[in-house]
Amino acid sequence: MKNLFEQSRSHWVRYDHYELKTAKDGKRYITPGKDTKPEVYNPLKEVPGIVLDALNVGMLMMSRSPAVEVERAVLKFVTRYGLLGLMTALPTTPAFMDYEAVYLPKNHFLKEESMDTDRYLALFYPFDQLDLVKRGIESAWKVSEDRTMVALTMTFMDEPMAKTMSFQRQYAEPYDWVAQQFKDWAFTLTTSILYYQDYRLIDQDTRELYQKAMAAFGGIAPSYHIELLDKPTIYWDFHSLLLGIQMMFSFMLVDEEHPLRLCKNCQKAFLGSHVNTTFCSPQCKNQYNVHKLSLIHISEPTRPEPI
């Protein structure tokens, strides 16, 4: 699995600062801060950290951690890796600007099967609209005179227009949607682990529920091509970070050499050295055993001292 990602590359954009802003309708969004600087990076070089970080944000939600703690973790993730690219992840194609409308498969966030393009774009530009004109399948976008934004647009000029648009400073993603995606990934990991851990303890109906839950995990497969660099390299055409993380997570989920596990003590996701690994660190193992011993002592009746 490690070699697969070592010989692969892709590109995404992250800014050096993100903030939470509230729109007129009261909905909260994550967006790059004012005058922040973008950076192009290869998310595949961040494996397995990027996947583990995403899962552990979701595990905070699964364990019903305080909202402030979850919010802090979400912003920390986004600052480190960038926004998820929901605008290009949700439609049937990231090239939706080439069509008269935006077509949407079933998802957690939007019930409509299709939306007017302007209405769809408004979901991701609640504060400052792009200078964009859309007529039928034709669209014209005037990039701001900000040199950084112009350079960023030129870097991704061969990519779908919507992907390049999502790298602009005006772009924002609903906080609740981003947080829900992390929770969905954590739920998938938990389902996979519990299915095998409790297999002999659950009935057939429960097993089928687990199987159906896992079958719902998936997405549109990314395209790729081979580049002849210092050695043949797979270039994955991720049009959203969400899709990239989903693919990396999928490979890690089926990796038997270093299986994804949940720590028995702190409930954090980690890569185990073998299937039966239950603790993410020696410290967690010691803490768990100390806590277990203290519970045993508490439950034991106090014996009277001999006279």
Where are these regions (language model features)?
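Short helix-coil boundary/hinge micro-motifs
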Residues: M1-F270
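Short metal-binding segments enriched for Cys and/or His
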Residues: N289-L295
